[in-house]
Amino acid sequence: MLGARERHVAALRWWEGDRLVGVALVEDTVAESRALERHVEARSPLFRAMSRVVHGRDGVLKFPVRVVGHVLGSGDAAYRFVPEISAEAAAEAVDRAVRRGPAGPSGRRPGVVLVKDFPLAAEAGAVGGSAVWRRGWFGLEFDPVMRVPVGAEWSGFSDYLGALKTKARTKVNRIAVCSEGCEFLELSLDEVQERAVALHSLYLEVYSGAAFRLGGLHAEDLVRMKSAWGEQFRVISIRHDGEEVGFLCGFLGEEGIEAFMVGFRPGFQRELALYQRMLIEFIRWGVESGSPWVNLGRTALDIKSSVGALPFRMAMAVRFRNPLLHVLARWAARLSRPRPVELKQAWRSEVLASVLGQAPETGGLRTRPCRLRRPCPRFHRGLNAHRVRLRTCRTATSA
């Protein structure tokens, strides 16, 4: 990422003598808000009125922002310090460095600084506008991060299927029927270099419909990450009838699988259930690699919960360089909260107890049983359709 020509990114490092004790990733980018009401619920008519004003007639709000953390990822990855450096000392060091940071590409420092993300306890109250990180900053919370737990004793994908409730397992099988004609082909570095522009165009098909954007993926990013991470960064091309209709990519890290980016042609989504199948492939990769978790990110909460993802609250710390704007933004944050969602519960209760050690904490998020909606037109064709299980062709990756 540091070498990407399209990105304005830098690494911060802290030393004690000759010893490296801390690192952080900082990137200057542009945030773009569209249809904010899809993710944030206003608790005041005044907040709704202000939101309409700042978004203008076009309903779009753009502003430069300096981000401490990965602009394209979700999770606690803003900075890292050695264990003997206390959390308070680490936060103070990052705060001081960001405040004194250099000017951006325009010759000026962005007026907004964002540090992301921080885990929140499920039972924590509203954090919008409060000092969740340090004084002089205020918290902001959007949708939770959705993660799928993987049992330590699971030896194959069938163990995942067996851990689901009947209706959820039926849905996974229905996804398999819908996408039965798809090939999932893992790309080598040379193939990623050759296909980078085409893959990026598929990504833009999805990115263009996002309600909130923080930076974006560049075609060059795929090549650089594949070159740097090798087999731990997988890029999967999805073909249907010989045509490339989508792709997915992700990381294998110490803490689990990180679903990174996907792209697909919208016209194929409903017929082939491409997005749902991508989620299943990430979960398969997690099971087969022995990872404890599969991080599926923040979007499409309902769909992800239907295949076993659980919500984990995350907050960001925000600071405006302009004191007046900072006060107004903090006040607005206090009048908003993440929009409540009704999530499905896909797991058998005894499985959750054995995998997590306790019942999952939903932090006020309502749950409901998994119900099948809009069945795939292929699902009821043939007497043996209900017996189809997820599988890949001989040329496909096992992820």
Predicted segments with their positions:
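Short, intrinsically disordered C-terminal tails of secreted or membrane-associated proteins
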Residues: 390-398
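Alpha-helical membrane-targeting segments
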Residues: 38-70, 321-355, 371
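Acyl-donor binding region in acyl/amide transferases
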Residues: 31-138, 256-316
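Active-site/acyl-donor-binding loops of N-acyltransferases
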Residues: 29, 76, 132-164, 240, ...
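A conserved beta-strand-loop-helix scaffold within acyl/acetyltransferase catalytic domains
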Residues: 1-43, 114-270
